[in-house]
UniProtKB/Swiss-Prot annotation:
Keyword Ubl conjugation: no
Organism of derivation: Caulobacter vibrioides (strain ATCC 19089 / CIP 103742 / CB 15) (Caulobacter crescentus)
Positions of transmembrane segments: none
Lipoprotein as UniProt keyword: no
Free-text function comment from the UniProt entry: Antitoxin component of a type II toxin-antitoxin (TA) system. Neutralizes the effect of cognate toxin ParE4, but no other RelE or ParE toxin.
One of the Pfam families matching this protein, by short name: ParD_antitoxin
Gene: parD4
Descriptive protein name: Antitoxin ParD4
């Protein structure tokens, strides 16, 4: 599934990994498979890992944007000018 321009390939050789879970978590995973949302526990875990990787990618992208903003220094425009520009970009003609 693409995320911020990053495409990961999931069709690779599979490795086996054993995971120990408390009973409550095991029951939760079994419930997810019994609901029909996932075919088996492995599919559920792979989906969790994909989502975690996508989340990490988004956080890294956001951090790059924050760093870029911090590195750009203090701007010369006033708060009023910044708000006016934001309203113009949003297509709003009046102050909120």
């Amino acid at each position: 599934m693409p995320s911020n321009g990053i495409v990961r390939s999931w069709r690779r050789a599979m490795a086996t990994m054993n995971v120990s879970l408390p009973d409550a978590m095991r029951e939760w995973v079994e419930g997810q498979t019994q609901s029909g949302r996932y075919h088996n526990a492995s599919e559920y875990v792979r989906d969790l890992i994909r989502r975690d990787q996508e989340r990490a990618d988004k956080i890294a992208h956001l951090q790059r944007l924050i760093d870029e903003g911090l590195d750009s220094g203090v701007g010369e425009r006033s708060l009023h000018e910044i708000r006016a520009e934001a309203r113009r970009r949003a297509g709003v003609d009046h102050e909120l």
